[in-house]
């Protein structure tokens, strides 16, 4: 069994390709169930967001697994396989596992270190677990990846530094005021950048939002998003008297506010600090405003400097997380190796118990006078001998499975005890049991989703 990842993301495919390969939230479960029916696919989890569609699978053979996953994507989205082939990225084995750790931790995201992807990865995994398309290997891998991503964010603080201009304004405002609870925000202009800044400020607990714009109707539309107040441009002076934070993004020719216009208003504000952010190009606010004692003025270049510094901090944190991933891969690899030893141990126990059972039958034939109590005592003690004899070989085979050259070591172990065929039988039995469990889980999910009147 092998782990494989097949898919596209913002690095490998343009948006016009990604949008053609995006699974809707409502169809994701059905897609995973259909993929599970394909040849070679033993387990699968599909992660689909605006920036990526990736299929994580456990396959019995890599080449057939790759083929059927690609064919499934082409058939599901009714697109020629050749049309998407150049954009598909395929990772196998340890590289596939490492990719999931990076995705969950936000290292493979367009915004380095973002946390939204972690929730999306967890949601896909829980859905696959619920409908039965994931199994022993992917359940362990995804659970480990989600747990690791949470720890990585907590220990490195990778998401603590703003890397967008709009959120950098929030970060600076917090440095000046300490907190934003109850602060009055004034938005000058109804442009995209101003809107984003207002959304981030509003999400951080500001009290009131006022929007001033040349067109009052646009001001009303934006203000409505924040239960705020709209004012015309002629009311700017009054709005400035009340504001604690000003975001300006009109891009008009000439300054919307000069030092001379603000100076008398500053006196009327009685020393209250005013945080002003000019994210317009050309600038809206007179740079001389910074000369006023209670005015803290920042422009787009100041914010870009903050973003650049924060991005550098995130990159340092990302480097630490990459080192942490190496340890996670070692741990997962060791677990995966011990998984392969389970049927070996089971086959060894079965052979030993079969010998014990034959020995008991022989004793009963040769000693027919034995009482029922005597038989029970003999059975108990012969089983005890078997368990004691097996203890050291089982401990040793577990160590072999976790060490270097594990496959060769296990093959030699099986040859010594002549259990090669028995191990294969155990593996087939385990696979049948897993398929049966998956089918039962899928059937139960279908029954649960069926309306009560159809039951």
UniProtKB/Swiss-Prot annotation:
Pfam families: GlutR_dimer, GlutR_N, Shikimate_DH. One of its GO terms (biological process) is protoporphyrinogen IX biosynthetic process from glutamate. NADP(+) binds at residues 189-194. Keywords: NADP, Oxidoreductase, Porphyrin biosynthesis. It is an enzyme of class 1 (oxidoreductase). Substrate binds at residues 49-52, 109, 114-116, 120. Its EC number is 1.2.1.70. The active site is at 50 (nucleophile). CDD domains: NAD_bind_Glutamyl_tRNA_reduct (cd05213). Pathway: Porphyrin-containing compound metabolism; protoporphyrin-IX biosynthesis; 5-aminolevulinate from L-glutamyl-tRNA(Glu): step 1/2. Catalyzes the NADPH-dependent reduction of glutamyl-tRNA(Glu) to glutamate 1-semialdehyde (GSA). Homodimer. Possesses an unusual extended V-shaped dimeric structure with each monomer consisting of three distinct domains arranged along a curved 'spinal' alpha-helix. The N-terminal catalytic domain specifically recognizes the glutamate moiety of the substrate. The second domain is the NADPH-binding domain, and the third C-terminal domain is responsible for dimerization. During catalysis, the active site Cys acts as a nucleophile attacking the alpha-carbonyl group of tRNA-bound glutamate with the formation of a thioester intermediate between enzyme and glutamate, and the concomitant release of tRNA(Glu). The thioester intermediate is finally reduced by direct hydride transfer from NADPH, to form the product GSA. HAMAP family: Glu_tRNA_reductase. Belongs to the glutamyl-tRNA reductase family. PANTHER family: GLUTAMYL-TRNA REDUCTASE. This is Glutamyl-tRNA reductase. The gene is hemA.
């Amino acid at each position: 069994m092998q782990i494989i990842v097949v898919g596209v993301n913002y690095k490998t495919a343009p948006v016009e390709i990604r949008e053609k390969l995006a699974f809707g939230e409502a169809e994701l479960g059905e897609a995973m169930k259909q993929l599970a029916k394909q040849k070679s696919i033993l387990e699968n989890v599909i992660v689909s967001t605006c920036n990526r569609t990736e299929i994580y699978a456990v396959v019995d053979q890599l080449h057939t697994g790759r083929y059927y996953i690609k064919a499934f994507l082409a058939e599901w989205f009714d697109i020629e396989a050749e049309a998407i082939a150049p954009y598909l990225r395929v990772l196998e084995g340890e590289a596939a596992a490492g990719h999931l750790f990076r995705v969950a931790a936000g290292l493979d995201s367009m915004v380095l270190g973002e946390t939204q992807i972690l929730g999306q990865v967890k949601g896909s995994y829980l859905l696959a677990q619920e409908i039965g398309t994931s199994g022993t290997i992917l359940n362990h891998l995804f659970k480990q990846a989600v747990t690791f991503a949470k720890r990585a964010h907590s220990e490195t603080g990778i998401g603590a530094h703003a890397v967008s201009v709009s959120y950098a304004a929030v970060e600076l405002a917090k440095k000046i005021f300490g907190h934003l609870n109850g602060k009055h925000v004034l938005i000058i202009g109804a442009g995209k950048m101003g809107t984003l800044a207002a959304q981030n400020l509003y999400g951080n607990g500001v009290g009131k939002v006022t929007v001033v714009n040349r067109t009052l109707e646009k001001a009303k539309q934006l203000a409505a998003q924040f239960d705020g107040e709209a004012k015309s441009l002629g009311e700017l002076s009054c709005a400035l008297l009340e504001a604690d934070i000003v975001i300006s993004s009109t891009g008009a020719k000439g300054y919307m506010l000069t030092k001379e216009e603000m100076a008398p208003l500053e006196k009327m504000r009685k020393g209250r600090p005013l945080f002003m952010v000019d994210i317009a190009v050309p600038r809206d606010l007179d740079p001389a405003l910074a000369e006023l004692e209670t005015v803290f003025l920042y422009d787009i270049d100041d914010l870009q400097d903050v973003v650049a510094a924060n991005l550098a901090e995130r990159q340092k944190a990302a480097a630490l997380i990459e080192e942490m991933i190496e340890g996670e891969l070692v741990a997962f690899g060791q677990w995966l190796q011990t998984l392969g030893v389970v049927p070996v141990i089971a086959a060894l126990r079965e052979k030993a118990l079969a010998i014990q059972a034959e020995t008991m039958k022989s004793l009963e034939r040769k000693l027919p006078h034995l009482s029922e109590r005597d038989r029970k005592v003999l059975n108990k003690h012969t089983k005890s001998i078997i368990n004691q004899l097996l203890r050291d070989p089982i401990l040793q085979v577990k160590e072999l499975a976790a060490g270097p050259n594990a496959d060769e070591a296990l093959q030699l172990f099986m040859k010594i005890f002549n259990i090669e065929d028995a191990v294969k039988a155990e593996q087939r039995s385990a696979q049948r049991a897993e398929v049966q469990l998956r089918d039962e889980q899928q059937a139960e999910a279908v029954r649960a989703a069926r309306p009560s009147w159809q039951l």
